[in-house]
Amino acid sequence: MKQYLELMNKVLHEGAQKDDRTGTGTLSIFGHQMRFNLQEGFPLVTTKRCHLRSIIHELLWFLKGDTNVAYLHENNVTIWDEWADENGDLGPVYGKQWRSWATPDGRHIDQLETVLNQLKNDPDSRRIIVSAWNVGELDKMALAPCHAFFQFYVANGKLSCQLYQRSCDVFLGLPFNIASYALLVHMMAQQCDLEPGDFVWTGGDTHLYSNHLEQARLQLTREPRPLPKLVIKRKPESLFDYRFEDFEIEGYDPHPAIKAPVAI
């Protein structure tokens, strides 16, 4: 994960001081890209321990089309609690947009099902895209989508994915985002009888919060360790039938966790 540390170092040394929605303040750069070859290992940050349970359950929650934190709570995941209302609802966030995008004529589009069909039947299409950035529903969302738009690409029997993330919390959020989309690529590839290719991450406002700077400097003193390997133990009937116990990470030997506050 040298690319991740290089990005963190760049933000620390080149970032502009900016105010932000949370009132915390950031060091920020605009426009950055990283590429991860998924054949070389699963891109889970090793210079601090990442909570893999939360990453997997959050992705399964998205895939269910769910927008209430009840499922997450059932699985001891609290990463969305700060934004949920008193009933646990978040409004039409990622799961709703991925699985049930509302059209003006009253229909609902399952973008993931559409993408799966494209990958299987028209893999050379340049329109294999999922968007969570629904302008008409942004004001109903507890948090506007940060990882907003992703595209799949098939070549030489391998499935690659590029994500555009309009806003990126480099210290806390980005390790989750990289691992989550890498996991999704592995799952989609398995369902389409392809091999995982590259995950390409493209960031817009890419920032370190002012109360994460010391933690970032500590992390930069640590030497990256070998990437772990993802094992998917079975091939379910569909993308939407995976369970938490289907996934195993082999050889994950990270440095200790580094705590930092979430900017809300």
Curated annotation (Swiss-Prot):
Entry annotation: catalytic residues? C146 (nucleophile)
One example of a Gene Ontology biological process annotation: dTMP biosynthetic process
Pathway assignment reads: Pyrimidine metabolism; dTTP biosynthesis
What UniProt keywords apply to this chain's record, in alphabetical order?
Cytoplasm, Methyltransferase, Nucleotide biosynthesis, Transferase
Catalytic reaction list: dUMP + (6R)-5,10-methylene-5,6,7,8-tetrahydrofolate = 7,8-dihydrofolate + dTMP
Look up keyword Transferase and say if it applies.
yes
**Top-level EC class:** transferase
Record-listed (6R)-5,10-methylene-5,6,7,8-tetrahydrofolate binding positions: H51, D169, A263
Q: Which PROSITE patterns match?
A: THYMIDYLATE_SYNTHASE
Q: Output the Gene Ontology terms for molecular function.
A: thymidylate synthase activity
> Any idea which positions bind dUMP?
R21, R126, R127, R166, S167, C168, D169, N177, H207, L208, Y209
Q: Where found, per UniProt?
A: Cytoplasm
Q: What's in the GO CC field?
A: cytosol
User: Is-annotated flag, keyword Lipid biosynthesis?
Assistant: no
The EC number(s) this enzyme carries:
2.1.1.45
Which NCBIfam families does this chain map to?
A: PRK01827.1-3, PRK01827.1-5, thym_sym
The family note in this entry says: Belongs to the thymidylate synthase family. Bacterial-type ThyA subfamily.
Assembly notes: Homodimer.
Summary of the function given for this chain in its UniProt record: Catalyzes the reductive methylation of 2'-deoxyuridine-5'-monophosphate (dUMP) to 2'-deoxythymidine-5'-monophosphate (dTMP) while utilizing 5,10-methylenetetrahydrofolate (mTHF) as the methyl donor and reductant in the reaction, yielding dihydrofolate (DHF) as a by-product. This enzymatic reaction provides an intracellular de novo source of dTMP, an essential precursor for DNA biosynthesis.
This protein is called Thymidylate synthase
What's the source species for this entry?
A: Cronobacter sakazakii (strain ATCC BAA-894)
